């Protein structure tokens, strides 16, 4: 009898240790940065499937470069799971009542003007400047049949919306708009919100490669008059002035004065209404090398056109550059800027820039 009790106790101990080990393994493979309270060990399954597919090239991204903050390695960035996760995050943030004022907007003419239509292949593309939109416009121009290849399209035509053959969604009747929004493949591209603002500032107020004089001669002086603290400073628009303008809760009156030129720095929410329009895919500038082929395939056009070659390193998030531009700007002004763009950070999974805010 004594031996039977010892055997029973030993069996119980083995079972108990097995249960503890199983629980530990499950916890180990849970995603530590998951957005919801309930976590599932999904990553292990996904990794196994991708390895079986033998993706030819693996790129390793640090956490800083992961747009959604999840623990995906480079060889998973083109995987459908990533894009499902982005859309799930978007839906969850859209439902957050605390962020409603930062995540929702009416589907106005301003929004419909941003969306370009390719009826031939049933595609809608929402323009978000400073994230490589010129190349996507070229893709759609070719698909619409205006040119046979991207290389043939003159740069002047791409931005001439009267001649490039890309109608805006706003040009259709209400019933036609509704039909296209319900049935067409819809996408847009985002990037780190603060890095996008730096790009807009450089492109419009520093280099101005398209020779658009109104940015320097009309918009810049208006911002300087209202937001420059040192009235003795005679330089052109500085990034600090730009940040104060964008972070001012009363910026709307200047936005109205500037008209459609504000598309280069207003929020993604204001441009594309992502909580009101159900988009099929949201690409990220930081992972565009993987996202562009995925979008083409998801839209069913990957055999008809290719996304132009991306120069090495051009889409990589540059923390050093961001720190350099924001150095010398008060924490108060940076926090006010973040308060305006918080919806963009949360909706698309970009990390809070604590290195600037604190």
UniProtKB/Swiss-Prot annotation:
3'-phosphoadenylyl sulfate binds at residues 129-135, 191-199. Predominantly expressed in hypertrophic, prehypertrophic and proliferative chondrocytes at E12 but is down-regulated in epiphyseal chondrocytes. Residues 1-6 are cytoplasmic. It comes from the Eukaryota. It is found in: Golgi apparatus membrane. The keyword Membrane applies. Residues 28-358 are lumenal. GO terms for cellular component: Golgi membrane. Pfam families: Sulfotransfer_2 (PF03567). GO terms for biological process: carbohydrate biosynthetic process; proteoglycan biosynthetic process. The chain crosses the membrane at residues 7-27. Glycans are attached at residues 101, 318. GO terms for molecular function: sulfotransferase activity. Catalyzes the transfer of sulfate to position 3 of terminal glucuronic acid of both protein- and lipid-linked oligosaccharides. Participates in biosynthesis of HNK-1 carbohydrate structure, a sulfated glucuronyl-lactosaminyl residue carried by many neural recognition molecules, which is involved in cell interactions during ontogenetic development and in synaptic plasticity in the adult. Belongs to the sulfotransferase 2 family. This is Carbohydrate sulfotransferase 10. It comes from Gallus gallus (Chicken).
């Amino acid at each position: 009898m004594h031996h039977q009790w010892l055997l029973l106790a030993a069996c119980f101990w083995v079972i108990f240790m097995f249960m503890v080990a199983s629980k530990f393994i499950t916890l180990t493979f849970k995603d530590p940065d998951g957005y919801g309270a309930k976590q599932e060990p999904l990553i292990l399954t996904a990794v196994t499937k991708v390895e079986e597919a033998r993706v030819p090239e693996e790129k390793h991204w640090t956490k800083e470069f992961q747009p959604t903050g999840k623990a995906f390695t480079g060889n998973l960035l083109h995987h459908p799971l990533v894009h499902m996760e982005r859309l799930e995050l978007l839906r969850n943030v859209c439902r957050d009542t605390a962020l409603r004022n930062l995540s929702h907007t009416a589907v106005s003419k301003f929004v419909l003007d941003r969306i370009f239509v390719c009826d031939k292949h049933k595609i809608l593309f929402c323009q978000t400047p400073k994230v490589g939109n010129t190349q996507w416009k070229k893709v759609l121009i070719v698909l619409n049949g205006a040119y046979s290849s991207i290389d043939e399209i003159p740069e002047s035509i791409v931005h001439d919306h009267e001649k490039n053959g890309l109608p805006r969604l706003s040009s259709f009747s209400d019933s036609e708009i509704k039909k296209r929004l319900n049935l067409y493949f819809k996408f847009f591209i985002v990037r780190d919100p603060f890095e996008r603002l730096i790009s807009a500032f450089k492109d419009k107020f520093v280099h101005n490669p398209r020779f658009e004089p109104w940015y320097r001669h009309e918009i810049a002086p208006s911002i300087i008059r209202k937001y420059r603290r040192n009235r003795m400073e005679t330089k052109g628009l500085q990034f600090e002035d730009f940040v104060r303008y964008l972070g001012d809760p009363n910026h709307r009156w200047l936005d109205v004065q500037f008209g459609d030129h504000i598309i280069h720095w207003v929020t993604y929410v204001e441009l594309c209404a992502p909580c009101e329009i159900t988009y099929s895919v949201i690409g990220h500038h930081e992972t565009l090398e993987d996202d562009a082929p995925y979008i083409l395939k998801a839209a069913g056009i990957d055999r008809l056109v290719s996304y132009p070659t991306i120069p090495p390193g051009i889409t990589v998030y540059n923390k050093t550059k961001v720190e350099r531009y924001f150095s010398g700007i008060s924490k108060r002004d940076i926090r006010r800027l973040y308060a305006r763009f918080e919806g963009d950070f949360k909706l698309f999974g970009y990390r809070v820039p604590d290195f600037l805010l604190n």
